[in-house]
Regions:
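Ligand/substrate-recognition segments at binding pockets and active sites
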Residues: 2-7, 70, 102-178, 187-188, ...
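Extracytoplasmic/secreted proteins, especially bacterial periplasmic and envelope-associated proteins
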Residues: 3, 7, 11, 45, ...
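Alpha-helical secondary-structure segments
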Residues: 6, 14-17, 26-72, 112-126, ...
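Ligand-binding "clamshell"
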Residues: 9-22, 165-168, 182-197, 254-258
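Small-molecule pocket liners
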Residues: 28-33, 198, 267-269
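Extracytoplasmic/peripheral linker and loop segments enriched in polar/acidic and small residues
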Residues: 45-48, 145-155, 184-255
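Structural transition elements
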Residues: 68-107, 123-128
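Long beta-strand-rich cores associated with HINT superfamily self-processing modules
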Residues: 251-274
Length: 274
């Protein structure tokens, strides 16, 4: 079983015929992604207010529930990696950004426009976070339209650059395998190409693109660390996205299997059956 729900782990662990082990040391990153095209999320202050409102612990308690299986982590390139840094994430990881969020909303002149937050209800690892985030945003003054849908509908809807009046959206939440976000080249959320070549949400941040190119051509780890830190700093300032927690999902398999390998994704070689 690749990803058993956390509440079933005690049952699996109590079975002497089953091995339960975390194979993915990088874990998963759950993230919130704003749409920079649609007002009021086109205002960086509104995006940063939404991010500041969130408490990672609340999100992770709802999603995972077991503290041993999650980390409070604001590192866009994953905690406990060479590029991990806290730069820009101090309020997010402290979970004390409510007053900051309220101040940003006041400064931006937020007028109560409903924020369309898509809520996939059919995927266990994605249905809790939007509820927690929506309430956190409401607590600081946002009006949130939490739109329930299945994951496939969300995947289709998030690709649309349409206005809200034409069925567009403001924000969604998804999860990434750590290996898919652990440097600036593979992390889609720090793509700053905007409407032409950017990932869903489409932030247009040319400086980040310059830095990603510099990262790609750098041959020094120390230099890459500095570049990654600067990218993260700008990404937080621009409200490109926010990691809202790192979590781990132990796998479970029959003791009749041998040779199961650690890795960032399941490997189906080297396995034999007794």
């Amino acid at each position: 079983w690749e990803q058993p729900p956390a509440d079933l782990l005690p049952i699996l662990e109590a079975n002497p015929d089953i091995t339960v082990k975390n194979l993915n040391g990088l874990g998963f990153q759950t993230i919130m992604r704003p749409n920079t095209l649609n007002a009021p999320m086109d205002d960086v202050r509104i995006r940063n207010a939404a991010i500041a409102a969130v408490n990672q612990k609340d999100v992770l308690d709802a999603l995972v529930g077991t503290p041993e299986l999650y980390n409070i982590c604001g590192a866009m390139f994953v905690c406990d990696t060479p590029l991990a840094t806290d730069v820009g994430s101090e309020t997010l990881t402290a979970g004390n950004g409510m007053e900051k969020a309220k101040a940003l909303l006041a400064e931006a002149g937020y007028d109560g426009t409903p924020i369309v937050l898509m809520h996939p209800t059919d995927v266990a690892s994605l249905r809790s976070q939007p509820v927690v985030v929506a309430q956190a945003m409401r607590d600081v003054g946002f009006v949130v339209d939490l739109q329930a849908m299945d994951w496939q509908t969300l995947v289709g809807k998030r690709a649309s650059q349409a206005s809200i009046a034409d069925g567009g959206w403001h924000m969604f939440i998804t999860n990434w395998v750590g290996a898919d976000v652990f440097n600036p080249l593979v992390n889609n959320m720090v793509n700053g190409k905007g409407k032409d070549g950017g990932w869903f949400g489409w932030p247009d941040v040319p400086k980040v693109e310059e830095l990603r190119t510099a990262y790609a051509t750098s041959q020094s780890l120390d230099e890459q660390k500095k570049i990654a830190e600067e990218i993260q700093k700008i990404a937080y300032e621009e409200g490109m996205y926010a990691p809202i927690g790192q979590y781990f999902v132990p796998a479970a398999w029959s003791n009749t299997l041998e040779g199961v390998l650690d890795g960032p994704a399941p490997f189906f070689w080297n396995i034999t059956k007794k």
